[in-house]
Amino acid sequence: MTADNAIFIPPYKADDQDVVVELNNRFGAEAFVAQETRTGMPVLWVKRAQLKEVLSFLRGVAKPYSMLYDLHGVDERLRTQRRGLPAADFSVFYHLLSVERNSDVMIKVSLSEGDLNLPTVTGIWPNANWYEREVWDMFGIDFAGHPHLSRIMMPPTWEGHPLRKDYPARATEFDPYSLTLAKQQLEEESARFNPEAWGMKRQGANEDYMFLNLGPNHPSAHGAFRIVLQLDGEEIVDCVPDIGYHHRGAEKMAERQSWHSFIPYTDRIDYLGGVMNNLPYVLAVEKLAGIKVPQKVDVIRIMLAEFFRITSHLLFLGTYIQDVGAMTPVFFTFTDRQRAYTVIEAITGFRLHPAWYRIGGVAHDLPRGWDKLVKDFVEWLPKRLDEYTKAALQNSILKGRTIGVAAYNTKEALEWGTTGAGLRSTGCDFDLRKARPYSGYENFEFEVPLAHNGDAYDRCMVRVEEMRQSIRIIDQCLRNMPEGPYKADHPLTTPPPKERTLQHIETLITHFLQVSWGPVMPANESFQMIEATKGINSYYLTSDGGTMSYRTRIRTPSYPHLQQIPSVIKGSMVADLIAYLGSIDFVMADVDR
């Protein structure tokens, strides 16, 4: 599939300084403090008084930064390695992305503990809404002018701000929990929906509106997810997505785990993505450490990541078709996934959560006979995809339920932070594997599937075509697997190569310390985004020169995709919402972290 209106994506330049020149010309160089990082983008600190003006300029500049990719905070109070940075108790960063420039810029602002206030930027980027709510929820930073600044991850009755450094990280540091009858009633009452709090009316000119809870326990909600619908008959007048039921504090956990021992936790973010979750994390850590992995490691990582893209998309395909009323395909897609997991298990030893990538390499070399398993799979799957297309995706009922439903264009997708198949279904040719190649993707031949309607049907068809392209990539990995080691020869590779521990006592001691306490990473910041199964996933790491991360920010694609729902579905029927939810392809662990 192609689109006639695809945006031209220029070649990617890391640390592109063009925007810095534009900012200096507009505001003067003295308005900014540049920070040297390993994030691959300019990082500039600005004063709070100029923050909104700077962000508005970047939103309106030629080839604008149309996407607020991420917005979050850092508790700076215990950070020791801050040379050259503005004094700050807390900081908030705004990560902006321009598809037309194919470049990013990060704007930071410092705050003192006694004055945690910033202006809202929801008028510049609508998707700032949830991000600002989360920053308030996690850090207690207020955003003046926000339309509804309230808890989003934690329950409404929660006390404290969990990502502050003085907030306990372990359950044993809290008082024992007991659920009294009074507390239970308070929690139940706090979950009651109040339409007026969200600017909704209970009555129209000639009718009373009905308010319907879809979820948090509903099969079409795809997890613990609640949407409160304001209905006029079956027409959706407005809606409020309610998330946080699956929140596990993944970013807080990262502050108490070593760089190495956090790898299994990444598997549980998008729990259908497997090693795809490991990839941005280990790449970001390797940037901190200055590790360049052998070519064989890159090819192995790409091959396994594409296997998990296929397993995730197969699950999407089956449940999506089931959501619109066809039962049989989901049983076939689950059976087909098992064939992929047989290959994955033979290589990694595990199925859903291998936690198999390592800092500087992978856990072990490819086993004997891996090539035959992979060859059989890549020869078998294309015929199955042909059958799905013919039997289900060309079905007139499915087309009638999904074509033209929940459609949006490229401009709207970028404003809401939509990435992955949701963005490419609008005709925007932005796939990081092509636009910003990582791990050697530039060495592979594959196409980026596009559509042009941006509706529920196109989002499905793009993912089906992506599976075909993943097969092409896996086949090239099979035919061109390099020889060589499966770990980098670097002091911070974890676990280190074990062979030399049998020869030198100093190497044995270093190996013991690195495995037990974890490697010590240089003080710096790094960032890595990848084209994951559900869109762009990234890790933004801050090291203070220790064995654990000072701050780990996990930006997931499903989070902004759910925030976009009200802007797309208003005026549609409840049945259209079900088709829309299925077409998004999300899991709540990816949303709530």
From Swiss-Prot:
It catalyses: a quinone + NADH + 5 H(+)(in) = a quinol + NAD(+) + 4 H(+)(out). Transmembrane segments: none annotated. The keyword Phosphoprotein does not apply. Pfam families: Complex1_30kDa (PF00329), Complex1_49kDa (PF00346). Its main location: membrane. One of its GO terms (cellular component) is plasma membrane. Its EC number is 7.1.1.-. NDH-1 shuttles electrons from NADH, via FMN and iron-sulfur (Fe-S) centers, to quinones in the respiratory chain. The immediate electron acceptor for the enzyme in this species is believed to be ubiquinone. Couples the redox reaction to proton translocation (for every two electrons transferred, four hydrogen ions are translocated across the cytoplasmic membrane), and thus conserves the redox energy in a proton gradient. This is NADH-quinone oxidoreductase subunit C/D. The lineage of its organism: Bacteria, Pseudomonadati, Pseudomonadota, Gammaproteobacteria, Pseudomonadales.
